[in-house]
Amino acid sequence: MNVKTQNIQLEKFFNPDSVAVIGASNTPFNLGATICNALKHYLEFPGPVVAINRKAEEVSDYPGYSSVKDVPHDIDLAVIITPASVVPAFVKQCGEKGIRNIVIESAGFSEQGAEGKKLQMEINDYAKQYGIRFLGPNCLGVMNNVSRFCCFYGAYDGMVNAFNKAGGVSYVIQSGGVGVVIFESLMDDMQGINKMVSIGNKTDVDEADLLDYFNSDNTQVISMYLENVANGIKLMNVARRVRKPIMIFKSGRTEAGTAAALSHTAGMANNDVVFDSMCRQAGIIRLKSISELYSLPKMLTEMPLLRGNRIAAFTNSGAFGSISADIMTEAGLTIPRFSPETREKLSKIKGVFNINNPVDIGPALPQVYLDLIDIILAAPEIDGLLLMSSIWRDFIIDVIKEVMKMCKHYDKPAAIYTPNSISRIISVRKQFNIPIFDSLEEAVRALVVSYEQFRYLRKKER
């Protein structure tokens, strides 16, 4: 199957016109019912939805049938959330009905021993027989923030906030639990998500397939959590074609981590040294933590890329200037001296404590901030800015908003850190979509990641 044909079929996972939720019923705590409820009441999904259960009962006012073959209209996507033992039979029914896209959210397959592996092989056989592409098994589902479609089980009304704003970052998550952590963090911060897909055991559709798909849609940055790589050569070849930033946090770096991944999503052990080498060759940014999955992408969606490693540190605290210099140097960034021309311009601004790099502005007024930053960003010896404000004042918000405009004007990025209450920072990020980081280390890491992406793209163009 060529890439174009594959992406056309994968499109139905994210933009189905009709959905069947197999296993949805009115039994208390039924997970399939939470999907129907979300589609009906929270997302107001415009297409037909049906519930498949033994009693053929309605769920959330959607009609019920005892088999997908009884549904009188075509179905684009089936979501199966039933005991593992009956999943193969439902996959066969879907094939006979002509359904070519299935999300299998049920667990109990190759991650749980010989019997589970046998069931998974049956699913594979039916999928090949009928030309079905499927996600999972043992996955959370799919969310498309652009079209307001979501088949996550356990969806609740608070998730509606996440659908108020579509962003530029799409996520591929092997673990449903990690997906929930990322989703909740982004929802609290009101960062817009583009799409999120949980792949679980990824028996059919894997991370490379989705990377290919996201390369052709309106995604800006692709962020992944993996416990193993299904096919390293395939992933590397696809990644080399992609010009969008790819970020991956992979667990299983140690023997203990690999053992845990095996029991969780049936992952095959991958050599971490080989994976690290693949990332460098394919231009994949390897992340160090779960938090980086949702904190760092905004640096690449909201700021220009860092085109060199020469950084100006700008603060109203001499201590933070010293601390940041250590962190940046250890990270491979440099803190160059300003040129005589830049120093002359800076010296004309009154009331500045120190015009050397790092700059210590002291307790200055907003216009002083902006005048200094304008000079620094315009300086040819500077590639980017680390902006730190140790004192929170309301005018800092206005300063940061203007700095965002300056960065776009000069085509240079700024990583922003203010060591104040998280609630204040989140409030600003929610309102203005500004990449403010929760720690100085995170802000410096964002600059490093931006520079890594620029260097790889430049290398590809040669």
PLM region descriptions:
Residues 1-462:
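Catalytic-core regions of core metabolic enzymes
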